[in-house]
Amino acid sequence: MANYIVGDIQGCFDELQQLLKQAEFNSQLDTLWFAGDLVARGPKSLETLRFVYQLGDAARVVLGNHDLHLLSVALGHHSAKRRDQTQAVLDAPDAAPLLDWLRQQPLLAEHQEFVLCHAGISPQWDLATARQAAQEVESVLRSPEWSTLIEQMYSDQPDAWHPTLQGIDRLRYIVNAFTRMRFCFPDGRLDMQCKLPPKEVTDGSLLPWFQLPQRIALEKTVIFGHWAALEGYVSETVIGLDTGCVWGGTLTMLRWEDKHYFSQAALPA
């Protein structure tokens, strides 16, 4: 019984299948954790959703920003992004159950030794606060009010956490921290613009969220995806698994028990 954690798939279904063959994944015995962004720019978002859906309890999924955007497109709130290849999902005869299942996935998933989220955990949160914050958004996404949240979540503000935040401002910060965050300012505020590799940010005004000196220490390893420019980042406290398969890089999967990494290069289109 092993736990496998895989980075952003973004519709790169064939690469995922190759990884699972490498690892000899057994859905009857093992658990497969997904770091979000099941869908978007790759060619097989529909096949990916169907596969993860049918895994049932063998799959643990957290929502990514592209997953949330697909829900927004399905609701008619926004248009698909230029490079997205998600129309097949919207046109599928099983679109309704797939999207209903997707919106009920969490922002944060926990193992005894690690936590999984798409972008990271706000440096201003301890683990108890992160759990509570995730549950607040998850409860709305699973309620009749979910469409309103999806419509109103698109903003870079507020960029700082405070326990007194209320309403859509509070929910928007939580969504941004879990699904969009990369860099923070030294005072802990989120920066939603810069997508560069950290080594290319030289003026000291921005730091990766996991390198802020005042970041609250967590008692579990944080595993995340989202940030392909990190090219897979590993430290004592965080593990980044997005290695840019959809951009021609690789799809990366970690077997937690022995910390073995599996890698599959992007296949020709």
UniProtKB/Swiss-Prot annotation:
It holds the Pfam family Metallophos. Its EC number is 3.6.1.41. Keywords: Hydrolase. Signal peptide: none annotated. CDD domains: MPP_ApaH. One of its GO terms (molecular function) is bis(5'-nucleosyl)-tetraphosphatase (symmetrical) activity. It catalyses: P(1),P(4)-bis(5'-adenosyl) tetraphosphate + H2O = 2 ADP + 2 H(+). It comes from the Bacteria. SUPFAM superfamilies: Metallo-dependent phosphatases (SSF56300). GO terms for cellular component: cytoplasm. GO terms for biological process: RNA decapping. Hydrolyzes diadenosine 5',5'''-P1,P4-tetraphosphate to yield ADP. PANTHER family: CYTOCHROME C5, PTHR40942. Belongs to the Ap4A hydrolase family. This is Bis(5'-nucleosyl)-tetraphosphatase, symmetrical. It comes from Vibrio cholerae serotype O1 (strain ATCC 39315 / El Tor Inaba N16961). The lineage of its organism: Bacteria, Pseudomonadati, Pseudomonadota, Gammaproteobacteria, Vibrionales. The gene is apaH.
